[in-house]
């Protein structure tokens, strides 16, 4: 239940909240006349490759709005406070990338063209708040690596400058997720930890499938897609060890894991608080990705009614 005067710990999450408040920016701060530095064909390829990241910003915005009251009910006041600034960040990224698509003169892929995006989105909303934070950390590592490429390669171009701004926000998101998971993982069962490891492998498998669809686009912009995925996998495994996932595994499960391409999902916690989207209404428009998600039978069966 929501408390009138909850316990309020001045921990890292509160400090991250303060940093987020001071670091706010908007589309009005962006010079949209900055050069693109892409040919028309490269702009189209970038628009396609950016699609999973773009949808991820929207998905994170919705997921945070569902998780926030769960944290309030659990008495996690500082996490609740931080997540409020996280919501603002994700909303800003969504708006900025929408404007970028207009500047590129291109549109993102549709769910029909890349159905793996819907699988990824649905996996993040399955389970409880611990599942969600772990999924967000994995997604943020992907986004960080993607944005870093362009922040370094095109520091004076429009997308390079946008990437630099977004990376500063993403660094806070990763710090939040890492702190929250480090604090939570020692309190869960070995079976629960194995489920989180399985979730990691499943999300990496979905990313692999998305890469197969975007291979030609990566080639068009000169991106080493295979090298990108290999570095991503290494970074995620490093983070998994840092937050204590491997240390918390039962002895029989401490061997190295491999990426699974199966679409099956690990079981969530025994009594999870599901990230229900029951409060959302099916969209009647067709102008955003969330509308496309809402119009799919799979999403409607997932309580989006």
Which stretches of residues belong to each language-model region?
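Non-heme di-metal
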Residues: 1-289
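Cysteine-centered motifs
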Residues: 285-288, 294, 304
